[in-house]
Amino acid sequence: MQKRRTVKESTKIRNGKGMDSGEKKRSEKRLMKFEELPRYLKDNEFIHNHYRCEWSIKETFLSAFSWHNETLNIWTHLCGFAIFTWMMVVSSMETTELGLAGFVSLLSGATIRWPWPSMAMSKDVYFSSDQTLHHDLNVTHTRSLLNSQGDVNYEAIPKWPWLVFLTGAMGCLICSSMSHLFACHSRRFNLFFWRLDYAGISLMIVCSFFAPIYYAFSCHTYWRLFYLSSISILGLLAIFTLLSPSLSAPRFRSFRAALFLTMGFSGVIPATHVLYLHKDHPNVLIALVYELAMAVLYATGAAFYVTRIPERWKPGAFDIAGHSHQIFHVFVVLGALAHSVASLLIMDFRRASPSCAF
């Protein structure tokens, strides 16, 4: 009996179907310790337990609904993806008034109609909300403003730059969630998904520039083209750089963070230019404050990502919840939301001055 079993196992090995360690781990479907992991799954030595290792695709997918050290990494960005998906759906509706007040009205139940023609259907002027929006508009002043500007070209305030940003944010967040979910399946999946994750981050950074630059520089075609082309080229270079398998290694964590921050902070140049051009417009000034908040949020998240605080201070204590990557994810979502507010404010500004009559 023992001899027959040995012959059977030998046949499986010759056919390439041996019971290697990976197959045993997949069949066991248990959470492992850091020291038990294959080298390609060893990323953070301060997280000691609750690792998934080479589970089947089905089991890996279903693990999104169980507790392990990647659960909150998956769901923090999956929830962010849901938020931006909702924003995309709302923005794609023909009757939606894009702009900050338009989104506030959707959340508060208020009805908002703007004092100028826009992408939405409304042309009357009133704010109606007894609960959250107490803001009176002077109808006479509004009509005189419209008369002084003449007919407004609806094409001057397109939706597509805003939708580009939402697409980039959604792409980044879903790629991140899928990477944290499936990267443990195999070495091949690990390499593919982490490279996809880094490409998604680069995509969101590039797409984030489109709405504010397009609307802020709508009357300055050369500068608009220059800034959008520059950040797009920089983003493509970053993506091609990060596609290198060696740069996906844990030891290049600081390099990746520095590259992403460099891309993000390159926005200081167009932001300064916008401030110079539109310093007398309150919406622009407030938008720049939100952009500053975005930069602080992203930089803070990157600091947690690189330093591995707080798990560095107490290894093993933050395996399930509270470790640095989860905190980093929260700051990324908050930073993207801050940028959303800034972009909507710039859109409000552009809609108020559609004819470039500054």
Swiss-Prot record:
Induction: By abscisic acid (ABA) and the cytokinin benzyladenine (BA). Residues 1-70, 183-198, 246-256, 305-326 are cytoplasmic. The chain crosses the membrane at residues 71-91, 162-182, 199-219, 225-245, 257-277, 284-304, 327-347. It is a multi-pass membrane protein. InterPro entries: AdipoR/HlyIII-related. GO terms for cellular component: membrane. Pfam families: HlyIII (PF03006). The keyword Membrane applies. It is found in: Membrane. May play a role in abiotic stress response. Belongs to the ADIPOR family. This is Heptahelical transmembrane protein 2.
